Amino acid sequence: SLFMLMKEIYPPAYSHFWTDNGAWYLNSQYCKENILKELLEEKADYYFIFYNNEIVGNFRILWDENLKGVCAEKQVKLHRLYLHQKIQGKGIGKKLVFWLEEKARENNYQTIWLDAMNEQEQAFQFYKKLGYKYHSHTFLPFNLMYARVRKMNQIYKLLSK
């Protein structure tokens, strides 16, 4: 199940950001009720990432989700991309981002954007290498998350035709 996958993927990377080791986040975002609600959203897609016939990650795409201040009519948000540690560094994330960029272009989207945790510098550098630029930041409203790690960088890429 998605919940079991996230219980394996999320804690090694993020448990130290939380007073409860991320249990509240996992239970609220990946409980059956929330997943069913998100699956019913009209302009959202959920994907599992497979590697060697094993599920190693997941992500969401939110179509027509706009980042304020970006002058592009059609925008798409890459939301909650998580990869298992054992396959990081194998180029899977890069292939996934390129796949999403191509899918967005095919559907006439001009911009892809996402939130990247300020405390996860390697993630920001990964997207920067792929041409994504800093736009602004926001703060997560999660009370069980330590205040010093709530900053999210909003980054984007304008897509060429």
Where are these regions (language model features)?
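Acetyl-CoA-dependent GNAT
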Residues: F3-K86, V97-F98, K103, T138-L140, ...
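Conserved GNAT acetyl-CoA-binding A-motif
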Residues: V97, A104-A116
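Conserved catalytic-core motifs of GNAT/GCN5-like acyltransferases
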Residues: W113-A116, K128-R150
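Short amphipathic helical patch at the helix-1/turn junction of helix-turn-helix
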Residues: L83, M117-N118
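Terminal substrate-recognition subdomain of acyl/acetyltransferases
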Residues: R148-K161
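Short glycine/proline-centered loop/turn elements that form peptide/ligand docking sites
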Residues: G93, V97, E119-A123, F139-A147
